[in-house]
């Protein structure tokens, strides 16, 4: 007999049936993973299934850390007689049962709840097919809140859509568009090829390069580099990249983490798409810095903006803060990895931050 009821209630029922004298009724304890927060952080946590009394991790942290979190069964080995009884002086070895390890995340639950609520509002108003949001500490790389839609309740498996399982923040890629402009401009300022006050002719919103037309959203003339960021000029950013040169632009994109995985404990994770330098065409240098012709995951974009925000220091994104063994009390801390700044010029950070602030002022 299986029971999903409260454990104390189950024990009372078991005792009552045993005293009644009924025959042919047997009891076996079984355990089921419970997710008390329901949809909260569902894609990241993942879930497990039961396969012939064996717990099988399916997605998320459950799958990545399956070996760590799986409990071990106890076992006793002994020598026995022909009758199957343990020999009094035979060898006996015992292995105690043990619980799985505990994972402590970098997530801050109040912020997580707010993020989930805001994402629900966005879905209600704009009705996109999918959406995701990530909050991170740029100095440590800690992911402090993350959510995506569609999502699911891991406690309710009926009619669950497998498309909702995917961790879109790690698997999805898209052309970043104007998100890339501050990255390219930061590289140009750091190389010293431009300053925030360097002026470029934005051609009244129409510019031909390599036989192809590049447009701005509205006509603009002479703009400083700061104004190019403020007004999100495609033409101005493309001209800045031409001053950098293809090799330096490629180095900048890769220094900010594009084209490689972030290493978060979620599988699968994409590396995005950044063509190797030898496969660039004539248009690449004017399109890549405005986020066209390359593709990145949400996590890669978050990591690159952590680098922008913290003074040029590449950081490893963290979802897990520490792993604890409940039996021994031993704690394995997942270290914060913060590399030396990629900037050569000490003024680069302040310059790019001031430009980005001007966009919202």
Model-derived features: positions:
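Small/polar-residue-rich segments within soluble enzyme cores
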Residues: 1-99
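Soluble periplasmic/extracytoplasmic beta-strand elements of cell-envelope proteins
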Residues: 1-2, 26, 43-47, 104-106, ...
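Serine endopeptidase catalytic core focused on the charge-relay Asp
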Residues: 13, 59, 108-122, 245, ...
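Beta-lactam-recognizing serine transpeptidase/beta-lactamase-like catalytic domain environment
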Residues: 81-94, 133-178, 183-361
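Conserved, well-ordered alpha-helix/loop/beta-strand core segments that scaffold catalytic motifs
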Residues: 88-131
